[in-house]
Design a protein with these regions (language model features):
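N-terminal periplasmic/intermembrane-space "pro-region" immediately following the signal or transit peptide
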Residues: 25-87, 93-97, 101
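Membrane-embedded beta-strand positions of outer-membrane beta-barrel proteins
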Residues: 61-67, 110-112, 151, 198, ...
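Transmembrane beta-strand segments that form the barrel wall of outer-membrane beta-barrel proteins
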Residues: 65-71, 78-82, 111-116, 122, ...
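Residues that define the transmembrane beta-barrel architecture of outer-membrane proteins
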Residues: 86-92, 130-135, 190-194, 201, ...
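Outer membrane beta-barrel
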Residues: 99-216, 249, 454
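Repeated loop/turn-to-beta-strand initiation elements of outer-membrane beta-barrel proteins
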Residues: 104-109, 146-149, 204-209, 216-217, ...
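Outer-membrane beta-barrel "beta-signal"
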Residues: 202, 400-404, 449-451, 463-477
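Detector for outer-membrane/organellar transmembrane beta-barrel domains
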Residues: 252-254, 275-421
Length: 477
């Protein structure tokens, strides 16, 4: 057993070391210091929604064409049920983020993405070729200089970490057709939740209250070939009543802890966000949430039965502890910006107590080997992992995350981003590198390469996607 634990940990350490060695030229780059490149979430525990006066509102609209090629593995130990991931896809979309001042301290905010898409597994033309994602649409009222009230669909984000946010409670089911594995982009591009939000700020603190009503019943997890065209998909965001109360108070000049209380359905969670500066270049942060719940496996099987995807009376395909008890989620790390560079590095440790243990992973693979010939077993096994992805939960209990962002890398107007997500239990992982070059104020070209690695009996080595290549062209309007 000791050999099993040590080897993946060593491999994970080697990957992290190699990650930083690849970026070492940036540490000596002679650029202007830009501490603003530290992710805003890591600078201090902010309010749930940062209030922006209408006079400072901006409009951001652009056209983008993104072509993705995804090589697939054909030697999976656990066969992936249909539909298999698309091997290629092209998406042309109009992305809009607009705000209009209606007068009397009232603004109307809209964020959405209109998609035209073609893929090897989608008939063209068809209703799947045209899609619209309504991310946000809400009225914002400012009764006084320190109070804001929002009504409508709002993307509320919480958390100080980068790779995983335990206190980002409204993340569940909100990500639709992601083009990247970068969590900082997924947080911005996801669906908002229909809600009433109130916020009050004062010198040294803030308080935010949110109520999101249930307007529909829970639905089955969507696949790539059954996404609706113009449905706002409130079933993804408003299938249960949800409440959030959060407050931050400045204890000192550089320490403003944030406390959160969240309730959804029959479960209650508490959380906190803590940041502290270490010198001029480093910020350490801790994000924690905890509450009563069952294991990820039990939750997935229960949701599958509730929505009709899995037979109600079928026994669990692998052992699942349905007992609800207090479980913890943690993201701890630091952000570092070297002197005289435009580079920001993040290194984090993630703990998801409800996630797969090493024994759970062995059970998952063994169930397929022993019972995969029984109809429904392999789809049920993959459903558990699809549920984790849909909920934006880590699949495994222990993981590490590394991210680097370098603006004006080597030449002006070139931005490089790289990240790694590593399972500390089996040493498998995902690597992604992105390059964007800003040709002018209105044109950008970019590329992205993704690689999953690990043994066939590992989290990432068992995925059908071996990696991916994305090419994009952006025209700002």
């Amino acid at each position: 057993m000791r050999r099993f634990i040590t080897s993946p940990a060593r491999r994970a350490g080697e990957v992290i070391c190699a990650f930083f060695l690849l970026l070492s030229p940036a540490l000596a780059a002679d650029e202007d210091t830009d501490l603003n490149l530290i992710p805003p979430a890591a600078q201090a525990a902010p309010p749930a929604v940062v209030p922006v006066p209408a006079s400072s509102a901006t409009q951001r609209n652009y056209l983008e064409d993104a072509f993705t090629f995804t090589p697939l593995r054909n030697d999976l130990l656990v066969p992936y049920p249909p539909p298999t991931p698309a091997s290629w896809e092209d998406r042309l979309f109009l992305d809009s983020r607009d705000e209009w001042n209606l007068g009397n301290n009232v603004t109307l905010d809209y964020s959405g993405r209109f998609n035209l898409r073609a893929a090897n597994d989608i008939p063209f033309p068809s209703h799947e070729s045209v899609r619209n994602d309504l991310r946000e649409l809400f009225l914002s009222l400012q009764p006084d200089d320190s109070t804001w009230i929002d009504l409508g669909r709002v993307n509320v984000k919480s958390g100080v970490a980068v790779g995983y946010n335990p206190t980002d409670f409204f993340r569940t089911r909100a990500v639709v057709e992601p083009l990247t594995a970068d969590p900082t982009i997924l947080r911005e591009d996801r669906l908002g939740t229909l809600m009433l939000l109130g916020q009050h700020v004062w010198t040294g603190g803030s308080v935010t209250a949110v109520f999101a009503p249930k307007v529909t019943q829970p639905t089955a997890i969507y696949t790539n070939i059954d996404l609706p065209s113009f449905d706002p998909m409130l079933d993804r965001t408003n299938a249960q009543d949800r409440f959030l109360l959060k407050s931050s108070v400045a204890v000192s000049n550089d320490f403003s802890p944030e406390l959160l209380l969240y309730h959804a359905g029959d479960r209650t969670q508490v959380g906190t966000n803590l940041t502290v500066g270490i010198g001029q270049q480093t910020i350490a942060y801790v994000e924690w949430a905890g509450g009563g719940r069952a294991s990820l496996i039990a939750d997935a099987l229960a949701y599958g039965r509730q929505t009709g995807t899995l037979p109600k009376q079928a026994p669990p395909v692998i052992p699942a502890d349905a007992t609800q008890y207090f479980q913890n989620d943690l993201a701890a790390g630091f952000s570092y910006t070297p002197v005289d560079t435009k580079l920001t590095l993040n290194l984090e440790y993630h703990y998801h107590e409800a996630g797969f243990t090493s024994q759970d992973w062995r059970n998952w693979f063994n169930a397929a080997a022993q019972h995969g010939n029984i109809p429904g077993v392999d789809p049920a096994l993959w459903y558990i992992r699809s549920y984790a992805q849909d909920q934006q939960e880590p699949e495994t209990r222990h993981s590490a995350f590394v991210r680097a962002d370098w603006t004006d890398a080597f030449v002006t107007d070139l931005e490089l981003t790289a990240l790694a997500n590593i399972n500390l239990q089996d040493g498998s992982g995902l690597l992604q590198a992105t390059a964007d070059y800003y040709l002018s104020r209105v044109w950008t070209i970019g590329g992205q390469a993704t690689l999953t690695f690990g043994g066939r009996r590992s989290e990432f080595g068992s995925l059908p996607q071996a990696g991916g290549i994305l090419l994009r062209l952006v025209r700002y309007l």
